Structures are given as C-alpha cells and as structure tokens.
C-alpha cells in the first residue's frame, strides 16, 4: 500500500490511508456448475458466450475499461487512443452477455442468485459472506483477483493547506488511526483496513480472509488509477458513450 500511495503522494507526506480495496470477480459456484463453466481466473473469462445474460458489469467508465484494457495486456492508465479503441470494441463485443451495468446492485443481485458472475469491489465481500451464511444459501459466492491484474484503491485523509482548524483535523486523523477505532470502522464499513494495529486486533478468520487481505503475490500486476488529464478523460468518456449506445 505504501508503494501504491506514491502514485498520488510520491513522498508519503500528505495522505494518511483510511481504507483500501481492489476490483475483482464474484461468482456463484453452483450456477457456473449448472452452466458447465469453470470458475473464472482471468478478466478474459468474462467474454465466455455461455455467460449470456448471467454477467453483471460495473457501470463505471474506468472500472469497465480496466477490465478490457488489462485483458489485452495494456495498462489501465493508458493514454494511447488505439489501446482505448481496442478496449472499447471488446466491451461492445461483450454487451450481449451483460445482464446489467450496475454498481451497488451487484452485491444484492448476486446474493439473490440473479446472475452467475459479477464485477465487484472487495470491500463488499464481508457483507456478502455474512449474508450467504445467515440466509443459509445452497451456493457459495467466491471472489477472485484476475491474473491479468486489476486496480487498487486507497481512501485517505488529508488536511487542506488552507484549513482553518489544522490542529483539530490532525487530532481527528490521529483518533481514526487508533487501532481500536480503525478496527471498529473496518467492522462497520467492511473495506480493508491498512492499519497494522487494527489488523492485529482482528479475529484470525478475518486476518486470513484472502478476499479482504490478499497475498501480495496476487497484487503483483495491480495498478492505482491515475488522473490522466482532461483530454484523455474525454477519450474515455466518448468511448464509453459508444459502448452504452450500442
């Protein structure tokens, strides 16, 4: 995470990490077995024609393009118009398989057994796992980080340089960094904590939950989303409009 945060705070001087997570694939093991499909391991698996009507994609420009770009071996922060066009065309090709482009609804639709596969953020997994257990569902919802790579996101606290109450802001951040408080926040919002002291307070089953705290090897191809400038943003926006319009 320290390496990842240098993407927006090169000297680690200004931002204090609060939560973090990644983008991955959630799948219903029973439904995939019924369809005769092996569990996904790569983004490219989301182009399997047998998933027609069974796929939930993120209704988010950079998330959708992360999938199509990394599938092709490109950086998810590419500024190359040709690579963006290739990713756009792949997303258009994929559209007949997509049941819906959604965001928060992926979680509830997958719990309800409405789809076989969904693209989701890792921070939803603890809630999902608890719901599957409490509802006594006869299928499992498993999370995988695709082999090609993904993005890591880090929510941080910073104090603006023109803050009128700088001392109070620092006290607030210090309070949130207390291990006991960071642990409570993790248990409430369920997105992974970067706080080592809070992590040490967690039960072993949470510490060993690879959906929430993956092994570093599984993040070796991960990147952090970067702001690419207005001109490149326009390229992505126009490409996404074409995807949605098809």
Regions found by a protein language model. Give the residues of each.
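A structural signal for short loop-to-beta-strand junctions that line the ligand-binding cleft
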Residues: 1-27, 53-55
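Short beta-strand->loop
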Residues: 15, 135-151, 160-163
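A bilobed periplasmic-binding-protein/Venus flytrap-type ligand-binding module shared by bacterial periplasmic
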Residues: 26-31, 70-73, 153-165, 184
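Ligand-binding pocket segment of bilobal, Venus flytrap-like solute-binding proteins
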Residues: 56-60, 64, 68, 76-142
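Conserved C-terminal helix/tail region of periplasmic/extracytoplasmic solute-binding proteins
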Residues: 108, 216-246
């Amino acid at each position: 995470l320290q390496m990842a945060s240098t993407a927006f705070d090169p000297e680690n001087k200004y931002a204090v990490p609060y939560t973090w997570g990644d983008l991955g694939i959630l799948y219903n093991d029973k439904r995939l077995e019924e369809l005769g499909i092996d569990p996904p391991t790569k983004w490219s698996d989301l182009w399997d024609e047998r998933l027609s009507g069974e796929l939930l994609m993120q209704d988010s420009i950079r998330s959708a393009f992360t999938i199509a770009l990394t599938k092709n071996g490109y950086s998810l922060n590419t500024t190359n118009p040709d690579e963006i066009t290739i990713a756009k065309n792949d997303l258009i090709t994929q559209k007949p398989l997509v049941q819906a482009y959604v965001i928060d609804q992926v979680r509830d639709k997958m719990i309800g057994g409405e789809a076989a596969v969904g693209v989701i953020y890792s921070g939803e997994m603890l809630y999902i796992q608890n719901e599957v257990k409490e509802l006594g569902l006869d299928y499992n919802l498993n999370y995988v980080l695709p082999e090609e790579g993904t993005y890591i996101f880090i929510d941080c606290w910073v104090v603006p340089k023109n803050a009128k109450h700088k001392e109070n802001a620092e006290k607030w951040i210090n309070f949130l960094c207390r291990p006991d408080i960071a642990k409570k926040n993790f248990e409430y919002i369920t997105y992974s904590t970067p706080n080592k002291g809070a992590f040490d307070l967690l039960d072993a089953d949470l510490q060993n939950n690879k959906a929430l705290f993956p092994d570093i090897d599984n993040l070796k191809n991960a990147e952090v989303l970067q702001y690419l400038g207005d001109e490149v943003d326009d390229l992505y926006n126009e490409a996404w409009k074409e995807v949605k319009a098809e």
